[in-house]
Structures are given as C-alpha cells and as structure tokens.
Amino acid sequence: MEISWGRALWRNFLGQSPDWYKLALIIFLIVNPLIFLISPFVAGWLLVAEFIFTLAMALKCYPLLPGGLLAIEAVFIGMTSAEHVREEVAANLEVLLLLMFMVAGIYFMKQLLLFIFTRLLLSIRSKMLLSLSFCVAAAFLSAFLDALTVVAVVISVAVGFYGIYHRVASSRTEDTDLQDDSHIDKHYKVVLEQFRGFLRSLMMHAGVGTALGGVMTMVGEPQNLIIAKAAGWHFGDFFLRMSPVTVPVLICGLLTCLLVEKLRWFGYGETLPEKVREVLQQFDDQSRHQRTRQDKIRLIVQAIIGVWLVTALALHLAEVGLIGLSVIILATSLTGVTDEHAIGKAFTESLPFTALLTVFFSVVAVIIDQQLFSPIIQFVLQASEHAQLSLFYIFNGLLSSISDNVFVGTIYINEAKAAMESGAITLKQYELLAVAINTGTNLPSVATPNGQAAFLFLLTSALAPLIRLSYGRMVWMALPYTLVLTLVGLLCVEFTLAPVTEWFMQMGWIATL
C-alpha cells in the first residue's frame, strides 16, 4: 500500500537522517522566531548553538541542509539582512575562489601525488621512518595545497592497496565488495587485520600532518586566508608571523609521531605484513612496466605545474584562487583532459563546502548584527595584553575542537579587528592576536573529526569502514597529538610569540602595517 502524503513528505525531509534529528531541526525552526521576539541576543546565541550542533552531527546529515534552513530563517525573521550576508560573502571572495579553483586544480595533479605516496609506501621498510615520511609529506603538501585534497590522495592510495590485497586474499580476480570478508580464510584474515591497523596509523599520521603544515601558511586552510586578509599579510609575512608558534609545534608533532610508533601507544605501531608487501610490490612493478611515455610526460608536467604553484604562492603573483585557476588551465591543457564532464568532476569535492561556507557567513552576519561575542571579547580585552593572547588561543581551541575552523576563525578575527579599529587594542597587539587566533583555531581542532575538515572527510570516506576507523577510534588515536599540539601551541603563544616577533621586526624581516 502506498504511504500517505504526510509520511512521504516526512521521509523526503532531510532524506536518510534519523527521525530524532529531523524533529530537533523542526523544533529549532519553530522556537527561534519565538525566542527572537522576546530576546534577540538569546535567540542569536541559540542559533549559534544550533549551527554548531549541525556541524557536530555532520555524519547524520551534511550541515549545508540544516544549517542553510536555519540561516534562511534567520534572514527572514530579521536577525540579519540579505544585504549584510552579501557583504560578508563579498569580503571573503578570495576564500571562495580558493575552495572553488585551488581544490579543483589539485585534482588534476592527483597522479603525481599518488605516485609520491606509492613510492614512499613501498620504498621505506622502517614503520617509524615511513610514518614520519607520511606526516612530513602531508605537512609539506598541505602548506601549499588544500588539506582535503592531500587526504583524498592518501585515501586513494590506501583504498587501492587494500583492494589489491583483498582480491588476492579472497582468491577472486574481480573483488567488487571490499567489505565482504566471507571468502577469506583464517590465515589471510589475521594478516588483513594487521594490514588494517597499519593503514589506520598511516592515515592518522597523514591527517595530523595536514594540520601541522596547514597552520603554517596562508593557503594551508581556508580560515588562514581570512585571517591573513584581515591582517594585511602576504604569503611570506604570514609564514614568518606564525613561525614562533608553528615551528616548535611542527617539531614536537613529528617527535610525537615517532614516539607513538616506537611505544605502540594509542593503536599505533602496526607494521606492513611481509605477505602484503610482496603482493603490492608485484602490482607496482607491473604498473611501472605498463606506464607509457605519455603517462610519464603527464607526471613530469604535473611536477612542473607544482613548482609553478609554489613559486606563484610564495611571490604572491596573483590571488590564491586565480593561481588555482591557472593550475586547472595548465594541467588540463598539457595532460589532455578536454571533456567538460571530466573537468566537472574536479569541482564535485569543493562546491558543497563552498556553499556551506556561504552559510557560515550568514551566521557570522547574525553574530555581528546581534553583537553576540561582545561580552566575551570585552572579558578578554579586560585582561592584560600578555594574557589576552592565551585567552584568545584557549577560547578558539575550545570552540574549534567541536565546530568548524572557518566558522570559528572568522568570528574571532572579526571581533579582534573591530576592537583594534575602535582603539581598544593597538595594531601591534592585534597582529599578535591574529597569530593566537590562527594557531588556536588550527591546532586544538585535531581533537575530533568535527574540528578538522580533513578528518571528517576521512571518517566519511569509503576507506573508513574498510580499515575499521570509527569516530571513537579516530578521537583516541588523535589524543596524543591533541595534547602535544595544544599544549606546545599554548606555551609558545605564552612565552615565545611576542619576543620572537619583536626580534623579527628588529631584523627587518617583518613590519607592522
């Protein structure tokens, strides 16, 4: 019997999301206008809490949908205006261009990145050295490329290798269901479990590597670009400004990588089984023999484009998004990708998040119009200048570990800039606060998948169920990194940021605008 109209509408609303989640959102949409009539300030904070809830529940439903409904209602009932939302979007156009074009541009360099990580995996036998190499490679790439893309490439490598061994273990040439272990005998299952543990640890090292590298440059994370623009910094300025905090954090993060592998803590330390290595090596040898001259030229061209990308960013030859567009044009032209649909695939990864970012800016507009963060900022600004840095870092860190970095970074840098423009803080203090905000937004956020977009991408990927990587296991494996990165970052903000920045100024390496 066909279901009723009401039941059909309920099923269509937010699709496969659980009923309790749908009900919660409906309650939010009913309650918000009523609270707004009584107290706009309370309603504003309620909206922020609801929006953070949708981000935290990203696995139940992509936040664009519920967050977008909340944002539309906020504009409709007068919490902010459509014009203010447009102004926020216009002010952050560079970030939208970064997400649209840079992420798509790197898509056309995936063959080179796959080649790099495959070589690393098969060339280095020491697990400690391999883990360190993955972490360093991910950090370096994330300093210039989008972290999501770097993680996507590592996922591609891992899924490919897992599939190769799974086919051998199941004795089937066509193994379409990688989650089906029923055809694998007991001996192979033991080896497969070890291989899963090995891949889990590598994926986590690579994921943390993207955070370590992403915090260092203005293109490493979308919020970095927002903060750099607000402070008026270019690529080199940003790197030097962050280095009093980010360089010690990078060193300690890499030492943590070695330590957890050596001591086999928190689920790390599993090595690549020799049987798996033999299978993968045979496959790689076969692939290399089949590689044509045309394939080799593609890799060389992509490497040259990579050099252009790094050079253009370092010398600030154009806006970041436009450099990304140049990468798309060069990579497609010189590697023979001419079909519109083939080019279109490059944009599927970035455009949903670009749309979500526009919704973020709607909520930011509400925060500004309702002056929601004014009490917090006033509390922080009442502290001494030295204490302000640590307080900004801590407040950013707490919110970033459960919410999205771009959202948090945008809110706090806007508030700090408003304080500077009103004369509450000096320009010099504002620049130090920008460093505290950026590092506070990026470093503690490795605590949960909600904080790091790259982690959330990994958790929701096809690889996660194959290697038994759940939300809880990811939080557990990230814990040593969370503690080290957060505490070292806080100590550096407290003790090294101001004196080292002062020394840089005396040396003439950086200047206050």
UniProtKB/Swiss-Prot annotation:
Q: Which residues form a coiled coil?
A: none
Respond yes or no to whether keyword Metal-binding is given for this record: no
Q: Which InterPro entries match?
A: Na+/H+_antiporter_NhaB (IPR004671)
At the top level, the lineage of the source is: Bacteria
- Describe the reaction catalysed, as an equation: 2 Na(+)(in) + 3 H(+)(out) = 2 Na(+)(out) + 3 H(+)(in)
> Which keywords, in A-to-Z order, does the entry hold?
Antiport, Cell inner membrane, Cell membrane, Ion transport, Membrane, Sodium, Sodium transport, Transmembrane, Transmembrane helix, Transport
Record text on activity regulation: Activity is weakly pH-dependent.
Name the Gene Ontology biological process terms. Answer: response to lithium ion
> What terms describe the molecular function in GO for this protein?
sodium:proton antiporter activity
Q: Which residues cross the membrane?
A: 23-43, 52-72, 97-117, 120-140, 144-164, 202-222, 238-258, 303-323, 348-368, 391-411, 447-467, 475-495
The record, for Pfam families, names: NhaB
Q: Any idea what a deletion of this gene does?
A: At pH 6 and at low Na(+) concentrations, deletion mutant grows slower than the wild type and its Na(+) dependent transport of glutamate and proline is markedly inhibited. However, when grown on these substrates at higher pH (7.5), mutant does not show any specific phenotype. A mutant devoid of both nhaA and nhaB is extremely sensitive to Na(+) and Li(+) at all pH values, and membranes prepared from this strain show no Na(+)/H(+) antiporter activity.
Give the membrane topology, semicolon-separated if more than one.
Answer: Multi-pass membrane protein
Location(s) in or outside the cell: Cell inner membrane
List the GO cellular component terms: plasma membrane
Q: Which family does it belong to?
A: Belongs to the NhaB Na(+)/H(+) (TC 2.A.34) antiporter family.
Q: Which HAMAP family match?
A: NhaB
Task: Describe the task this protein carries out.
Answer: Na(+)/H(+) antiporter that extrudes sodium in exchange for external protons. Catalyzes the exchange of 3 H(+) per 2 Na(+). Can also transport lithium. Essential for regulation of intracellular pH under alkaline conditions. Is necessary for growth on Na(+)/symport substrates such as glutamate and proline under conditions in which nhaA is not expressed, such as acidic pH and low Na(+) concentration.
Q: What else is known?
A: NhaB seems crucial when the level of NhaA activity is growth limiting, when nhaA is not sufficiently induced, and/or when NhaA is not activated.
- What is this protein identified as? Na(+)/H(+) antiporter NhaB
